[in-house]
Design a protein with these regions (language model features):
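Conserved acidic donor-binding segment of nucleotide-sugar-dependent glycosyltransferases
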Residues: 336-345, 353-358
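Short hydrophobic beta-strand element within catalytic cores of glycosyltransferases
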Residues: 319-322
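Membrane-proximal helix-turn-helix segments that form the acceptor-binding/catalytic region
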Residues: 111-114, 129, 144-168
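Carbohydrate-associated surface elements
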Residues: 174, 195
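Aromatic "clamp/platform" in nucleotide-sugar-dependent glycosyltransferases that forms part
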Residues: 302
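Conserved donor-binding/catalytic core segment of Leloir-type glycosyltransferases
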Residues: 212-230, 236-239
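N-terminal subdomain of nucleotide-sugar transferases
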Residues: 1-51
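Nucleotide-activated donor-binding/catalytic signature segment of Leloir-type glycosyltransferases, i.e.
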Residues: 264-282
């Protein structure tokens, strides 16, 4: 049995990123065909246990001592990862998967590849950092320095992965061409859109006890990290516009992250306490209960490479509303209303349209269900990717 070493040393907090979800779900489904070891942070180990990924070989590298301090924590975890990688023995035929493009994951994987060029390095590179001075960057004003550090730290990683990785996981079709080299053809750059566990939703619909549209508690829901890229602050402004037309509209917000305090303060400032329920981090059955009670899924990301959480909600028949980002064109060709980028008023109008036009809602709902069935099934994704990497 081939060995797979997964490096997930950058996992932080309690929230689950799209990249984290990808390696957890894939490794669950590969565990019978590969001998898997995971080198992970303390927080990452807790997240994996919570999500049912408990391989026999789960080795904790970084502690959470500097968690929340982005730059210091990145340096600490990278140094820990380097020393740990120097002590690992990997042999010809072994597979190394770096779960993100962040330095604490990518650099240790590169060291293992450098020590033994015969191992196969699969590098995950799911999102190019925006140039902080560009118009589309979410890192403006006081966020500029954070965006600059993020962008600068990714430059050496991109070079190393492009030059030395055997296979690259990306999420967006437009990113494929950026990793083609003389030694790596297009077949070695694999778009990994992620997936959805469709079974719970299928069982729910088969029972024929689903909640009618007019009886659902929430007009919309949001799932995602409280991060500038996810548009969580923009969402509060959008919901204010919705409530100007429909004063009693309610939205469920699922997630946690570094912007929690700003989100709380903005809700109070806009007097939306009665219209917005902050539910924190939810997973599994608790999250599904919110989907059952919601009418729409909103994805107001301002910079993104996909958006897997939206597909989860679509599996429960929720049509989506999002900005018309380039990456979403291939991810969500149907089942979603696309809005002119960063026009908050137009975004609110699309929400209001789906809430008032039941025929339009039904059409998009059926499209969403079909899209998930066709393109987002985890079992199909996992088997297809395994075939390509082994």
């Amino acid at each position: 049995m081939k060995k797979l070493f997964i490096i997930a040393n950058w996992m932080q907090g309690k929230a689950l990123s799209g990249g984290d979800r990808i390696f957890i779900e894939l490794s669950k489904r590969w565990s019978q065909k590969l001998d898997i070891s995971i080198f992970i942070s303390k927080e990452g180990a807790d997240i994996c246990s919570r999500d049912g990924q408990n391989p026999a070989n789960k080795i904790i590298w970084a502690s959470d001592i500097f968690s929340g301090h982005y730059t210091v924590d990145g340096v600490y975890r990278t140094i820990i990862g380097i020393f740990k990688a120097l002590s690992i023995r990997a042999y010809q035929g072994d597979i190394i998967l770096s779960s993100s493009d962040f330095l604490p994951d990518a650099i240790p994987a590169f060291i293992l590849k450098f020590k033994n060029p015969k191992v196969k390095w699969i590098a995950s590179f799911y999102l190019f950092a925006p140039k902080p001075w560009q118009k589309k960057s979410p890192y403006k004003g006081t966020k500029y320095l954070l965006g600059l550090v993020y962008w600068l730290s990714q430059l050496p990683v991109y070079y190393i992965i492009k030059q030395f990785a055997d296979i690259v996981f990306v999420t967006s079709q437009p990113d494929i061409k950026l990793f083609i080299t003389k030694h790596r053809g297009i077949e070695k750059i694999i778009p990994v859109r992620g997936g959805v566990d469709v079974l719970p939703a299928r069982q729910y619909f088969e029972q024929e006890e689903f909640i009618p549209f007019e009886n659902r508690s929430y007009d919309a829901c949001f799932v995602g990290r409280f991060h500038y890229q996810k548009g969580i602050l923009e969402l509060i402004h959008i919901w204010k516009n919705v409530c100007k037309i429909r004063p009693h509209s309610r939205i469920a917000i699922i997630g946690i992250g570094p912007l929690e305090k700003k989100v709380h303060n903005l809700i109070i400032h806009m007097n939306l306490q009665a219209n917005i329920d902050l539910l924190g981090f939810l997973n599994g059955a608790d999250k599904y209960e919110v989907f059952k009670k919601s009418k729409i899924i909103v994805h107001p990301a301002t910079y993104d490479s996909g958006g897997m959480a939206t597909a989860e909600a679509m599996a429960w028949g929720l049509p989506g509303v999002a900005f018309d980002l380039e990456a979403l064109k291939s991810y969500y060709p149907k089942g979603m209303l696309k809005t002119e980028c960063f026009n908050l008023g137009a975004f609110a109008n699309n929400i209001l349209y789906l809430l008032s036009d039941l025929n339009a809602h039904l059409t998009l709902s059926q499209e969403a269900l079909a899209l998930v069935k066709e393109q987002w099934n985890w079992e199909q994704q996992a088997q297809s990717i395994l075939h390509q990497i082994t």
